[in-house]
């Protein structure tokens, strides 16, 4: 049993077995797990916003889907991952508050999921599984040994994807 490496909000980290990696409290944020199943190298980024180019205070690259995913790929390659072997699992992107509006700025969760999928597609990293949207938060734990992403939500049964 290894260490559980924590990833905070607008943060990222990488790990190898026997360690696992987790992030807590994904609401509209998206937790993105990238891993190389052959080398069992994995990483996670907890993104808050879809696009760094639309924000002035954008120094924290882990905060954004566009820059966070790029940096996570870089860190995984340094750890020994093979670029063409990387695959993804994603969770989060909930609509945490009920409202009736067509204002695109209020659809943060949906926009985060869209930006994540677009970025992964542009990098040719397939998404093997996802648990996104709806109206509840999630905590996720990834085990690089089994490639399972455990998803916990209040009042919901745990699931593995």
From Swiss-Prot:
Q: Which Gene3D superfamilies did the record assign?
A: 3.30.1330.200
Gene Ontology terms, MF aspect: protein-glutamine glutaminase activity
Q: Which CDD domains match?
A: CheD
Q: Which reaction does it catalyse?
A: L-glutaminyl-[protein] + H2O = L-glutamyl-[protein] + NH4(+)
Any idea which UniProt keywords this protein has? Chemotaxis, Hydrolase
Which SUPFAM superfamilies did the record assign?
CNF1/YfiH-like putative cysteine hydrolases
Covalent S-S links between cysteines: none
Enzyme Commission numbers on file:
3.5.1.44
Q: Name one GO biological process term.
A: chemotaxis
General function of this protein: Probably deamidates glutamine residues to glutamate on methyl-accepting chemotaxis receptors (MCPs), playing an important role in chemotaxis.
Q: Which family does it belong to?
A: Belongs to the CheD family.
From the Swiss-Prot or TrEMBL record, give the protein name. Answer: Probable chemoreceptor glutamine deamidase CheD
- Which source organism? Lachnoclostridium phytofermentans (strain ATCC 700394 / DSM 18823 / ISDg) (Clostridium phytofermentans)
